[in-house]
Amino acid sequence: RDRHNVFLWVAIIVALFTAPVRFTFLFGQINLLLMMLVTIDCCTSRRRWWTGMLVGLTISIKLTPMVFLLYFVCRRDWKSVGMTLGSFLVYNLFALLVMPSTTRLYWTKIIRDSERIGAYHYCRNQSINGALARFGLHDSSRSTVWFIVALIVGLLIAVIVWQLVKAQQYFAALMLNGIAANLCSPISWDHHWTWIVPVSYTHL
């Protein structure tokens, strides 16, 4: 056990020097916080009545965590799926009450503006779409190829996640689900890849 603890602390220290963690702190990002909320919500041996509320909160902050519905679906935890979607709706209704103009602006205009995120071909976009963009594909053809490749990769990962859940390897399933989000997302900057950090823990 002592040896395991030593390895764990070494992994934590090393993680602080990895690009995703360093750039998260450097750019003042919240990816580590979102990862923590999702992990707390999902990695439990027993289901709580509020399971899904934290994932719903992360989706309200950033839409990408919606991919973690796959984890609940693979566990056949339909109650948590409903709690996630319901809490997401409640959080956004609350935002609409508190900041009506800002909330309407986001859902009617900002969410459709892909240019606000950055250039797809930029080297720090480590998603499948970013790799295709750096091959020089035109936007229309790249979008089609990206959709097909991302769909295939997503389906393959979904099968593996389901197998891990079936084997009760919940932590590994969740980590792989997070990596799938980074791979298949249109843009995944290097500081988005915080999900690769806890993967090392599964091998200790």
Give each language-model segment a name.
Residues 55-72, 185-192:
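Transmembrane helices and adjacent periplasmic/lumenal helix-loop junctions
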Residues 1-51, 75-197:
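Primarily membrane-embedded glycan-assembly and transfer machineries that use lipid-linked glycans
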Residues 202-203:
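Conserved small/polar residues in nucleotide/adenosyl-binding loops
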